[in-house]
Amino acid sequence: MSTNTVPTPDDEGPTEWIGDLEVRRVSGDIQEHADLSTRSKARKQALDILFEADLIGTDPLEVLAARPGVFTNPVRPFAADLVRGVAATQVGLDSVLTDCLSEGWTLARMPRVDRILARLGAFEILHTDTPNPAVISEAIELSEEFSTDDSAPFLNGLLGAVITHGPARVEDQPSDDAASLTCPAPDGGSEQPPITVDDVGSMASSSDSFPAEVGNVDTTSGNASDPENSADDFELTGGEHPTSKDHELATDLHKKDTTDD
């Protein structure tokens, strides 16, 4: 993978290529690119990319790689970090979020944009040192712009449960690597070796062993469809038929992304 040091709008160091797209290198410290003045726009851009990937049922990294080049509409470094981080840890994130939902509710039955915002928020809570109130505030702000009236209180409760009951965040783990997370063994035995945000393949396969003994948040705010009326064979990725509202939202997200400086 080739690297160079050509300056770009958010340049903080060497870049790397993801397909034909030149983006900032993701370091061991996910916070390297979390500049306070740009991270809100970066989260919106990450939401756009992850939403599109979920909509068409493809790998978020493929959508990231297909985005315009650096001189037309650059992918913000922190947005790339978030997309790659969520893609690397999605199995574990979904496990934690599912355990924090009340009985009978699933991620698959949540509105698509809320599901993506929940993953983004859970990733920042569990894998970065972004202050928890800031994570929830950003998720609420984006939900108010792109989702339903019920989404803000729903996400507030869900992410609050992740903070209270979810696995300890990265900085609380007994590890020298600030971006690693030690997961308990599935059989209750000794802990598995730490896994890192950089190791996309191994993290995606190992992060399904988060603790399940977490409290549930009441999600009866009307933000998700009635579980009694939902198909049991629903698949989270690629099995959800996009609605006209989904396509309108995808267009709106992308339009805002391309016009945001």
UniProtKB/Swiss-Prot annotation:
Q: Which InterPro entries match?
A: NusB-like_sf, NusB_fam, NusB_RsmB_TIM44
Task: Give the record's keywords alphabetically.
Answer: RNA-binding, Transcription, Transcription antitermination, Transcription regulation
* Superkingdom of origin organism: Bacteria
* Molecular function terms from GO: RNA binding
Query: Which residue intervals are annotated with compositional bias (Polar residues) in the record?
Result: 217-228
UniProt-listed SUPFAM superfamilies:
NusB-like
A biological process term (GO) from this entry: DNA-templated transcription termination
Query: Which spans are transmembrane here?
Result: none
Cellular component, GO annotation: cytosol
Q: Segment Disordered: which positions?
A: 168-261
Query: Where is there biased composition of kind Basic and acidic residues?
Result: 242-261
Q: Which family would the database say this protein is a member of?
A: Belongs to the NusB family.
Q: What does this protein do?
A: Involved in transcription antitermination. Required for transcription of ribosomal RNA (rRNA) genes. Binds specifically to the boxA antiterminator sequence of the ribosomal RNA (rrn) operons.
Q: What is this protein called?
A: Transcription antitermination protein NusB
Q: What is the source species?
A: Cutibacterium acnes (strain DSM 16379 / KPA171202)
